[in-house]
Every structure is written in structure tokens, then in C-alpha cells.
């Protein structure tokens, strides 16, 4: 059934959507109202970066900051914005693969709209100091986004502890269904819509909901978080053995 429809099968479908949303939100310590489902992590990244850029451009803030080794969903979104007249600063990592908060702060300008730094690098595995970078961004009134696709379900992720404004994730990274992602937006943070149409996702992302995908994503993340300590201990054992 269609979860937006007012008949019995539609109500049943909506229950699956609501349950999946609650499961994903709980896993990252967010409110269900702060979670918006997407088709993948790349869509969530595009929405966070481009939606923020379009929103902040109305305040004459057209500068963005990211790292030089982000996922292509971020890098290509930034490149697209540059072609539209936005300016982007790319922070180079240290030799060990980390982004230093002081380098981010040095790059912030009065017209900076967004800082977007990947939480866990998908190629070299470094985990960035997102909490400290978010504190720097907020000190200057700048929104903070992190691509946590590689982190959610693999390491503890608590959006309140991190202090981020937006966070992207993808279901397939924690054994959920492909074609499902989500964007966390802290209460009061609204990047401009990229997909307009119906009133789904609190009018922020149109399109009939992928009920099975949402249910699968919620259950998969619930299971991943439940067994997280056990899995991390096993992976540490394997790493140390190698």
C-alpha cells in the first residue's frame, strides 16, 4: 500500500515507514522528525551540499569548505556548485590522513555557508575529528555536514555528541537494501529541497516512499548497532593479527 494514502493497507505501510524511521533515528541518537529517507547516500550528500548552498546563497554566502579526499558524491557536488559561481576551499589532509580543525578554521570566511568533512574515509580508514570540526564551524555560524556513509553501522555514531547539523548514511553499508539512504538534519536546519512534488518526508523530499527499503534499512541498522561491540572487537582482533 501507499503510506500516504488513507485506507487500511496504506495505514499498514505507514506503520512500516514510521518503525523504520524510528529505528534509524534511535541508532544515531536523533529524533525521528530529524531523519529524511533518500534513494542512497549520494543523494543525501547532494542534498546536504547543494541544498545548503542554495539556501545560504540567499544570504550572500557562497563559499564552501570540504576536504581534498571526499567521496565523489561530495567532490562532484562541489564541482557542480563551482560551475554555478560558488567558491570551494579543499583542505588537504595531513600525511597520516587527517583533517585538522585548525586548518578548517583558517579557511572559514564571512561568506562561508558549509563545512562538509567525511567522518570515516572509505579508502584509508581514517576517522576524522568531526566533533572538534563542528565546534569550529559553529563558532563562526557555519553549518556542518558529515558524510558518515562509511561510519554508520561500523562505529558508534551519535549526532548529538558529534554536534553536526547534517549527516548522510547509506543502508547497503550495514547490510541493508541497496537503493536506500537517509539524511539527518538537526531540528531547525533545512537545506533547500532537491526533489519537489508531493508532501512526503515532511514536504522536504517528494516521491512515494520505498516502504520495503525503509523497513529493511531500519531493521538492518538496528541489528548492526546491537552487535556493534562484538563486531568491532572481532575486527580489532583481525587487524592486530595482521
Region roles according to the model:
Residues 1-242:
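Pyridoxal 5′-phosphate
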Amino acid at each position: 500500500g501507499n503510506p500516504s494514502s488513507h485506507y487500511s493497507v496504506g495505514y499498514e505501510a505507514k506503520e512500516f515507514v514510521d518503525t523504520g524511521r524510528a529505528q534509524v533515528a534511535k541508532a544515531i541518537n536523533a529524533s525521528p522528525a530529524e531523519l529524511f529517507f533518500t534513494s542512497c547516500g549520494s543523494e543525501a550528500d547532494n542534498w546536504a551540499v547543494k541544498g545548503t548552498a542554495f539556501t545560504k546563497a540567499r544570504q550572500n554566502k557562497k563559499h564552501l569548505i570540504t576536504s581534498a579526499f571526499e567521496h565523489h558524491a561530495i567532490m562532484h557536488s562541489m564541482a557542480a556548485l563551482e560551475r554555478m559561481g560558488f567558491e570551494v576551499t579543499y583542505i588537504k589532509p595531513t600525511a597520516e590522513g587527517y583533517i585538522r580543525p585548525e586548518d578548517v578554521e583558517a579557511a572559514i570566511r564571512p561568506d562561508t555557508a558549509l563545512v562538509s568533512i567525511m567522518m570515516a574515509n572509505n579508502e584509508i580508514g581514517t576517522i576524522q575529528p568531526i566533533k572538534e570540526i563542528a565546534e569550529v564551524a559553529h563558532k563562526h555560524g557555519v553549518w556542518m555536514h558529515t558524510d558518515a556513509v562509511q561510519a554508520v553501522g561500523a562505529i558508534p555514531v551519535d549526532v548529538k555528541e558529534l554536534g553536526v547539523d547534517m549527516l548522510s548514511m547509506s543502508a547497503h553499508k550495514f547490510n541493508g537494501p541497496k537503493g536506500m539512504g537517509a539524511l539527518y538534519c538537526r531540528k531547525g536546519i533545512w537545506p533547500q529541497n532537491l526533489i519537489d512534488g508531493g508532501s512526503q518526508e515532511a514536504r522536504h523530499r517528494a516521491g512515494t516512499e520505498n516502504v520495503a527499503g525503509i523497513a529493511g534499512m531500519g531493521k538492518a541498522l538496528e541489528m548492526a548497532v546491537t552487535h556493534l561491540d562484538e563486531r568491532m572487537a572481532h575486527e580489532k582482533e583481525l587487524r592486530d593479527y595482521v
